[in-house]
């Protein structure tokens, strides 16, 4: 049978096929030559079948449906001169995807990028790779290779299913971390725990109130001590409780020297006794946490620990000052008392110790930290406005004899009060020009403050909703948690993902 007869048979067969179901079959490089050595088409039927199913044929024929064992010789993955441009077929549970080999070779450590790994799934009879996996998920997997490492979950694929596909195709920990971040999994800093079991128990007891009932009890005691300390700090300034603790200078005529004495014995003062009890607890807590902490360097980098240190310094500074000032001259005593008052003022920072046990204060701190740029812009705008309007009101009021603005620095306070819309009224312009400047100052202040406020509020809402969602929403399905946890161990990672209500925390397992 000659070539013309075979082509007539092809036309006849194509006419019987449904044209709607015809798909173009991709061509593959092969060492098979459909022509004879003399350049003429071969006369064997198999050579004609090869011509009919080659990529020069635009329509599928009945011969293209012949099983591969009658057409393609079985063997390993086809090799061509330009392997980078070679097209490969990936069959995902019957859905075929076509891409170039160089696209897959971008990531040689993955399942599809490693030749040895993907050859385990090569079907030599059909000349394609076959994976009995989730079909819609492979859109995102193939996009990872095409985009150079960007992972995107298709909208119609559940999170746990796509996470399992990332694990199966061995895309790596970076792809999994990117997927977690895109899906709203907030990765918290890694939690370090002491290696010693005894130290770990005390560290959890004082550092993590939610770890046990005993830890919650310690947290309650710590909060009560802080509240008592702040209460004592405020009550001792009341007139009915305040005693003159400054030293009285008593002149002794016989020796013509100054002798000093305390208005009352400091060690019998009830406020001092209560304060000492609070300081004992603060010191014990601080020293114990320092001894059992897993990293001494990180301990001093923690702002909460710095606040704890600052909160107990005034007590010991006051105690030392009171004990040594009896031998000092009167002038040095006055200086010591001035320093002592400043040191005592630092005690007010103990209120920040409550943030260790208050989610609200932690959210506020996170908001301020995230909004530092906006707060800096706000202060910068206020600074410009203060300089501008204090100068303007000075020159507007300079000819007024009863003006409150004797200089530009005197107008700083008025500009700040006016721009913040407080308006104490202690200083105000009296001339028409000064009132116009005051009006513009108030309007500029409203606009200046209003501009960065929405960004700060947005940051607060973000941290607030993230925290409330962690407490109110139910846990995610255990299947997803299992997949994500197994992903870390499969990739050789020591991190495990605990996602609760839209957030995740990385905990390092230590021996």
Swiss-Prot record:
One of its GO terms (biological process) is potassium ion transport. The lineage of its organism: Eukaryota, Metazoa, Chordata, Craniata, Vertebrata. It holds the Pfam family BTB_2. Gene3D superfamilies: 1.10.287.70, Potassium Channel Kv1.1, Chain A, Voltage-gated potassium channels. Chain C. It is found in: Membrane. GO terms for molecular function: voltage-gated potassium channel activity. This is Potassium voltage-gated channel subfamily A member 10. Voltage-gated potassium ion channel that mediates K(+) permeability of excitable membranes. When opened in response to the voltage difference across the membrane, KCNA10 channel selectively allows the flow of potassium ions across the membrane down their electrochemical gradient. A motif (Selectivity filter) lies at residues 421-426. It comes from Mus musculus (Mouse). Belongs to the potassium channel family. A (Shaker) (TC 1.A.1.2) subfamily. Kv1.8/KCNA10 sub-subfamily. The N-terminus may be important in determining the rate of inactivation of the channel while the tail may play a role in modulation of channel activity and/or targeting of the channel to specific subcellular compartments. It comes from the Eukaryota. Disruption phenotype: Viable with no gross defects. Vestibular evoked potentials (VsEPs) are highly abnormal suggesting impaired function of the balance organ, although mice do not display any obvious imbalance behaviors. A lipid is attached at residue 293 (S-palmitoyl cysteine). The channel activity is up-regulated by cAMP. Its main location: membrane.
């Amino acid at each position: 049978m000659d070539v013309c007869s075979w082509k007539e048979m092809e036309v006849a067969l194509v006419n019987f096929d449904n044209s709607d179901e015809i798909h173009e079959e991709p061509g593959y490089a092969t060492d098979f030559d459909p022509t004879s050595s003399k350049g003429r088409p071969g006369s064997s039927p198999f050579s004609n079948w090869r011509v009919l199913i080659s990529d020069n044929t635009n329509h599928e024929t009945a011969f293209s449906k012949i099983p591969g064992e009658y057409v393609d010789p079985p063997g390993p993955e086809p090799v061509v001169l330009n392997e980078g441009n070679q097209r490969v077929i990936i069959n995902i549970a019957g859905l075929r995807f076509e891409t170039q080999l160089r696209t897959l070779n971008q990531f040689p450590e993955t399942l599809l990028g490693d030749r040895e790994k993907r050859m385990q799934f090569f079907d030599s009879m059909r000349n394609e790779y076959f994976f009995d996996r989730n079909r819609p998920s492979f859109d995102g997997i193939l996009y990872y290779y095409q985009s150079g490492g960007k992972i995107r979950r298709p909208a119609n694929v559940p999170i746990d299913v796509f996470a399992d596909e990332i694990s199966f195709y061995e895309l790596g920990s970076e792809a999994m971390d990117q997927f977690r971040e895109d899906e709203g999994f907030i990765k918290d800093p890694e939690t370090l725990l002491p290696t010693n079991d005894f130290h770990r128990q005390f560290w959890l007891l004082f550092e993590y109130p939610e770890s046990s009932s005993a830890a919650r009890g310690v947290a309650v005691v710590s909060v009560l001590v802080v509240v008592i300390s702040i209460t004592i700090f405020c009550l001792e300034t009341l007139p009915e409780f305040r005693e003159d603790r400054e030293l009285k200078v008593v002149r002794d005529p016989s020796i013509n020297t100054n002798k000093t004495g305390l208005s009352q014995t400091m060690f019998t003062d009830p406020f001092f006794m209560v304060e000492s009890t609070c300081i004992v607890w603060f010191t014990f807590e601080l020293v114990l946490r320092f001894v059992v902490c897993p990293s001494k360097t990180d301990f001093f980098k923690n702002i909460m620990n710095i606040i704890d240190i600052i909160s107990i310094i005034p007590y010991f500074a006051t105690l030392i000052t009171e004990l040594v000032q009896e031998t000092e001259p009167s002038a040095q005593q006055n200086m010591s008392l001035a320093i002592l008052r400043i040191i005592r003022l630092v005690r007010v920072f103990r209120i920040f110790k409550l943030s260790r046990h208050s989610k609200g204060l932690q959210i506020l701190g996170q908001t301020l930290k995230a909004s530092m740029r906006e707060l800096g812009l706000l202060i910068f705008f206020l600074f410009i406005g203060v300089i501008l309007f204090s100068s303007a009101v000075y020159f507007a009021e300079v000819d007024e004899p009863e003006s409150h603005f004797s200089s530009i620095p005197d107008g700083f306070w008025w500009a700040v009060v006016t721009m913040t819309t407080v308006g104490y009224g202690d200083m105000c312009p009296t001339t028409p020009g000064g009132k116009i400047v005051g009006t513009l100052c108030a309007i500029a202040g409203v606009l200046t403050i209003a501009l960065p406020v929405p960004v700060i509020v947005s940051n607060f809402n973000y941290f607030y909703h993230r925290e409330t969602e962690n407490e109110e929403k139910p846990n995610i399905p255990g299947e997803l948690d299992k997949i994500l946890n197994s992903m870390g161990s499969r990739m050789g990672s020591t991190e495990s993902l605990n996602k609760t209500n839209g957030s995740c925390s990385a905990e390092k397992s230590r021996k």
